[in-house]
């Protein structure tokens, strides 16, 4: 008997979600069962965890399970669990509303590919709504563990924009979802069809999934049997687990639709005993760069689920890794706070980090094509590694990939080991340039002398690169050197002597240029970097790089005041022309023009672009 029944409207976003799910995934209908079983499994996990501190929640029934029953006469499928259950408020919140951000992201990720889109519903936590792909009405009966039988609820909807909810006495805790199938979906009334779907998607679920036994004639009996393996897969030895089972477990814990690139499964014995199963995904999740997004591994203690997104077992730069840690020695009532200062957790974290880096190194060595796919998805995150993890800096550095002047492509595919192996005889530094974009780096005038001498330069255009080179100042005994900071020594004594002679000859010109630019520059020098350009701006050796200054300014950060050094090419026709200009106004016009041109070529911005345009026009008129 239902009491205090109310009719409520779905949140606008849920209406939109229902429409998308039903109409986008109709050709892959079977995924409804995968999602509902996954939700039931989560409910059992939550109950077992909460019962660690409150055993009364079991209500004298600690035999946790999922059951599926088919009623051909009524054309229904019922998925039941004796997990944590739902209260009235939870039913309204979980079944009637959804986070707007989740809806927006779900919609933006839809591709029109049935196989891919069918997996997104789990990734975005909206798997329950897949029930409406096959059902024209869904009835949910539930009672949260610990509440009175009279607090049981019944929720019902036809997926048409509203739902009803009321109280109904329920003696047992947990949730029972009944799907009233649409006539065209009667294939799911077949016992063998349902068993096949369970075998395909849910065999790895560690809770038993029960269905009624079948006689040899295929008729149901009153007895139930377990139709999945119901084993914590990660506790088995590697030899006992098939590749397909590893992949299905990954998809279950990650809600990903693609197979992982690789994985590492380890049983550790000794002072501390634990199991780790770590996966490298094939693509980045939608929330990889959202600061508030939750990342981390699933934590179990002696096979008992403790928490999702345990971030303490991997550093943040490896937040893309999915997997499981099952520890034998941690207390069952461990909290996130206790995890922070636990010596065993620190030990597991160090081991997990080394295993992930080892996995990636193996992939980079043995399967360069797959590693390149990984880098294209996660390279930007991995570049955070040397900044965060000093202990593993060398191992991470070997995994980094870059664009270079030798590769001739924006694609980041050159390792530092490759760069070092190609270094010129006598070259003792790894040269790089940072810029706001690949094209800005590739076309920088600072590269001219390096191109002439055939010296390879790393082209760094990711924002994180400025921080990366600040923390990773050498590799394989070779110092990393910015070609846009300080002096460049390329071991050419003849050129150095020539510049010294020219400095004496051109001293009056240099002084005149300094007087024009005044406090806009730290100094004016002759350059040994340029072959084709008249001038360039560089940062002093001890100053912050010009690109870093721009990044910080764009972020609204305080930037130490530092002025660039203006370097001129004495062999360029425009610099030679300065000798012949007698008019001070014209000289000032030309010098200012050359300086601002150099700032723009280096990717900088001018304080007053309109003045620059006026100067260009004046020079064009006078030429």
From Swiss-Prot:
- Supply one GO CC term from the record: cytoplasm
The entry assigns this protein to a family as follows: Belongs to the heat shock protein 90 family.
What PROSITE patterns does its record include?
HSP90
* Intracellular or extracellular location(s): Cytoplasm
Chief place of localization: cytoplasm
Instruction: Relate the assembly described in the record.
Output: Homodimer.
UniProt keywords, alphabetically: ATP-binding, Chaperone, Cytoplasm, Nucleotide-binding, Stress response
What's its job?
Molecular chaperone. Has ATPase activity.
Which lineage ranks, top first, belong to the organism behind this chain?
A: Bacteria, Pseudomonadati, Pseudomonadota, Gammaproteobacteria, Legionellales
Give the encoding gene's name. Answer: htpG
| Domain of life where this protein originates | Bacteria
List the InterPro entries hit by this protein, alphabetically.
HATPase_C_sf, Heat_shock_protein_90_CS, HSP90_C, Hsp90_fam, Hsp90_N, Ribosomal_Su5_D2-typ_SF
Q: Name one Pfam family in it.
A: HATPase_c_3
Task: Give the span(s) annotated as C.
Answer: 551-623
Name this polypeptide is given: Chaperone protein HtpG
GO molecular function (one): ATP binding
Coiled coil regions in record: none
Spans annotated as B: 337-550
């Amino acid at each position: 008997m239902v009491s205090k029944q109310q009719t409520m409207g779905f949140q606008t976003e849920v209406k939109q979600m229902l429409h998308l799910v039903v109409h986008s995934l109709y050709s892959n209908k079977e995924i409804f069962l995968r999602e509902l079983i996954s939700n039931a499994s989560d409910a059992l996990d939550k109950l077992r965890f909460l019962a660690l501190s409150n055993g009364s929640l079991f209500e004298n029934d600690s035999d946790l399970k999922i059951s599926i029953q088919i009623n051909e006469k009524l054309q229904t499928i019922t998925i039941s669990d004796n997990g944590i259950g739902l209260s009235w408020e939870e039913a309204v919140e979980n079944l009637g509303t959804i986070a707007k951000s989740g809806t927006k992201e779900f919609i933006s990720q839809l591709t029109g590919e049935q196989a891919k889109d069918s997996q997104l519903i789990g990734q975005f936590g909206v798997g329950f709504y897949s029930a409406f792909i096959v059902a024209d009405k869904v009835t949910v009966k539930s009672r949260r563990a610990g509440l009175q039988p009279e607090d049981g609820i019944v929720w019902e909807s036809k997926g048409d924009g509203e739902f009803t909810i009321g109280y109904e006495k329920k003696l047992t805790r947990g949730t029972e979802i009944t799907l009233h199938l649409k006539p065209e979906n009667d294939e799911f009334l077949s016992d063998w069809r349902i068993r096949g779907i369970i075998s395909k998607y849910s065999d790895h679920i560690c809770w038993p999934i029960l269905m009624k036994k079948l006689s040899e004639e295929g008729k149901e009996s009153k007895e139930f049997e377990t139709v999945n393996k119901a084993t914590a897969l990660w506790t088995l030895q590697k030899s006992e687990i098939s590749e397909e089972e590893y992949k299905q477990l990954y998809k279950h814990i990650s809600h990903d639709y693609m197979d992982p690139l690789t994985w590492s499964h380890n049983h550790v014995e000794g002072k501390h005993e634990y199991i780790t199963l770590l996966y490298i995904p094939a693509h980045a999740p939608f929330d990889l760069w959202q600061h508030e997004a939750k990342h981390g591994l699933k934590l179990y203690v002696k096979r008992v689920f403790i928490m999702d997104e345990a971030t303490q077992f991997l550093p943040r730069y490896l937040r893309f890794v999915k997997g499981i840690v099952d520890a034998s020695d941690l207390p069952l009532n461990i909290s996130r706070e206790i995890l922070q200062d636990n010596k065993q957790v620190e030990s597991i974290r160090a081991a997990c980090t080394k295993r992930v880096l080892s996995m990636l190194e193996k992939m980079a060595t043995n399967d360069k094509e797959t590693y390149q796919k990984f880098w294209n998805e996660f390279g930007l995150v991995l570049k955070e590694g040397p900044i965060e993890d000093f202990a593993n800096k060398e191992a991470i550095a070997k995994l980094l990939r870059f664009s270079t002047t030798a590769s001739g492509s924006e694609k980041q595919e050159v390792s530092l080991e490759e760069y070092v192996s190609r270094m010129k005889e006598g070259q003792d530094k790894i040269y790089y340039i940072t810029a706001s974009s690949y094209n800005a780096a590739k076309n920088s005038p600072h590269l001219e002398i390096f191109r002439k001498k055939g010296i390879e330069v790393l082209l760094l255009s990711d924002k994180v690169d400025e921080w990366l080179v600040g923390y990773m100042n050498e590799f394989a005994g070779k110092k990393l050197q910015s070609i846009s900071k300080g002096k460049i020594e390329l071991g050419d004594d003849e050129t150095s002597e020539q510049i010294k002679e020219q400095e004496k000859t051109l001293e009056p010109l240099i002084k005149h240029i300094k007087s024009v630019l005044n406090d806009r520059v730290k100094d004016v020098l002759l350059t040994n970097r340029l072959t084709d350009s008249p001038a360039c701006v560089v940062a002093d050796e001890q100053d912050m790089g010009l690109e870093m200054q721009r990044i910080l300014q764009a972020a609204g950060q305080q930037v130490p005041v530092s002025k660039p050094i203006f370097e001129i090419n004495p062999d360029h026709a425009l610099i030679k022309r300065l000798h012949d200009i007698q008019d001070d106004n014209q000289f000032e016009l030309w010098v200012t023009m050359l300086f601002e041109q150099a700032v723009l070529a280096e990717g900088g911005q001018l304080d007053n672009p309109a003045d620059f345009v006026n100067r260009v026009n004046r020079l064009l008129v006078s030429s």
